[in-house]
C-alpha cells in the first residue's frame, strides 16, 4: 500500500475507489479505514475516496468510516424509494428512519453522503420518482445522483425477454462517458445499451427526470 500511495501521489492521482459495494459491513473494513487514514497522513494520499457502503447497519457505516472523515464520499444506493418498484427489482432498502439517522449523523460531522437512484426501473413513474427525490431531500442527504439504467448481460434487463416485454422496455445505445480515444489514426468508441422508457415512464418523462 505504501508503494501504491507513493506512485499515486507522484502521478498526481488524488483519489481512490473502494471496489466493494458493501463497505463497512465486516470488521476488516475498519482496519482498511485505519490504513487509508495512515496513508493520508504520511503521503497526503488519497485526498478523496469513493465507496459504496452496506445498508443494513447504520452504526457500522458511521463508525467504520469515521476515521476517513470528509475524504470519504459515502454512496448509499437506494435505486428507488417506491415499494412496488423495489418489489419488481427484488430489492429491499434500508429503512427510511435509519437512512435519515445516517444522513443526519454524517451531516453533523461535515461528512458528505450521496444517494443513488436508477432510472427507469420497472414500475417507476415520473411522479413516484419525484416523490422519492423529495423524500431523500427531507433526510438531509448531501447529494442525489440519478443513474440511467444500463442493460447488462446477466440481468433481466438484458437477458429476460419476458421481463422486458412485461415492462415494455425501450433502449438505445450511447457513448460510455470518457471511453473514447484515437489509436493508430483510428477513432475508438465504447458504447453501452441503456433504458430510456417503460410502460410506466415515457421517453418524455425520462427526459423530465434529467432536467
Each language-model region and where it sits:
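Catalytic cores of alpha/beta
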Residues: 61-64, 122-138
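Flexible glycine/acidic-rich beta-alpha junction loops that bind and position SAM and/or redox cofactors
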Residues: 26-28, 84-90, 119-127, 140-203
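An acidic site on a long C-lobe helix of protein kinase domains
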Residues: 95-98, 125-128, 205
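Short intrinsically disordered, low-complexity coil segments enriched in acidic
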Residues: 1-11, 153-154, 161-164
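Short, hinge-like loop/turn segments at secondary-structure boundaries
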Residues: 35, 132-133, 161-165
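Charge-patterned, long linear interaction tracts outside catalytic cores
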Residues: 202-211
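Conserved SAM/AdoMet-binding glycine-rich loop
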Residues: 2-114, 119-121
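Conserved beta-strand->loop/alpha-helix structural units within folded catalytic cores of enzymes
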Residues: 115-117, 136-139
Amino acid at each position: 500500500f505504501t508503494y501504491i500511495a507513493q506512485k499515486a501521489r507522484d502521478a498526481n492521482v488524488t483519489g481512490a475507489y473502494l471496489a466493494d459495494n458493501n463497505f463497512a459491513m465486516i470488521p476488516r473494513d475498519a482496519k482498511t479505514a485505519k490504513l487509508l487514514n495512515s496513508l493520508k497522513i504520511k503521503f497526503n494520499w488519497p485526498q478523496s475516496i469513493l465507496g459504496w457502503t452496506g445498508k443494513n447497519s447504520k452504526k457500522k457505516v458511521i463508525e467504520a468510516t469515521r476515521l476517513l472523515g470528509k475524504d470519504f464520499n459515502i454512496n448509499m444506493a437506494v435505486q428507488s424509494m417506491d415499494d412496488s418498484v423495489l418489489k419488481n427489482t427484488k430489492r429491499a432498502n434500508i429503512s427510511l428512519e435509519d437512512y435519515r439517522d445516517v444522513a443526519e449523523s454524517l451531516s453533523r460531522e461535515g461528512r458528505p453522503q450521496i444517494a443513488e437512484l436508477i432510472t427507469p426501473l420497472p414500475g417507476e413513474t415520473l411522479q413516484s420518482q419525484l416523490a422519492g427525490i423529495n423524500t431523500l431531500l427531507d433526510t438531509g442527504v448531501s447529494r442525489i445522483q440519478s443513474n440511467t439504467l444500463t442493460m447488462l448481460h446477466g440481468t433481466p434487463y438484458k437477458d429476460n425477454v419476458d421481463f422486458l416485454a412485461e415492462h415494455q422496455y425501450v433502449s438505445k445505445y450511447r457513448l460510455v462517458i470518457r471511453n473514447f480515444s484515437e489509436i493508430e489514426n483510428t477513432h475508438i468508441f465504447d458504447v453501452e445499451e441503456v433504458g430510456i422508457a417503460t410502460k410506466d415512464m415515457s421517453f418524455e418523462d425520462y427526459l423530465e427526470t434529467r432536467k
